[in-house]
């Protein structure tokens, strides 16, 4: 493996690590928000931290699974696309159609709520579940 390819894989792995750290920290804090934000008036500082963490998680997941144009996208660092897809869908126990539907929810969340403010999506959309993203990230990490 050449140095450039190794660096590309390392960059993608770094995105997966940041995703994992952010989403797990979010879950750890989200479970005790009422306690942490007690006595802070209208500031709700830990709720703000949680919002930043879930946004960071969505952004970093999308760096590996979002747009093919990203240098850190799995298609740019894994040569056997069909082999990875097969492995991913088997590990997640999902179909390509189901994963694409999830991918669409996650990328729309990132684009319409996190990266840009789309008022219509913000009021009508919902935050996607992150268990699938966690499993996909772990699968990509294992495969790389």
Model regions and ranges:
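Histidine-centered, metal-coordinating catalytic motifs and their short helical/loop contexts
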Residues: 96-124
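Amphipathic alpha-helical interface segments
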Residues: 1-105, 127-144
């Amino acid at each position: 493996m050449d140095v450039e390819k190794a660096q590309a894989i390392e960059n993608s792995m770094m995105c997966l690590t940041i995703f994992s750290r952010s989403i797990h920290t979010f879950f750890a804090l989200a479970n005790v928000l009422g306690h942490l934000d007690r006595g802070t008036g209208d500031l709700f500082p830990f709720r703000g931290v949680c919002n930043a963490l879930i946004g960071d998680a969505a952004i970093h997941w999308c760096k590996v699974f979002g747009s093919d144009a990203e240098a850190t996208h799995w298609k740019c660092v894994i040569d056997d696309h069909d082999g990875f897809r097969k492995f991913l869908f088997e590990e997640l126990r999902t179909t390509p159609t189901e994963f694409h539907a999830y991918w669409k929810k996650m990328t729309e969340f990132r684009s319409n709520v996190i990266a840009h403010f789309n008022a219509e999506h913000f009021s009508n959309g919902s935050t996607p579940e992150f268990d699938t993203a966690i499993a996909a990230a772990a699968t990509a990490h294992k495969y790389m």
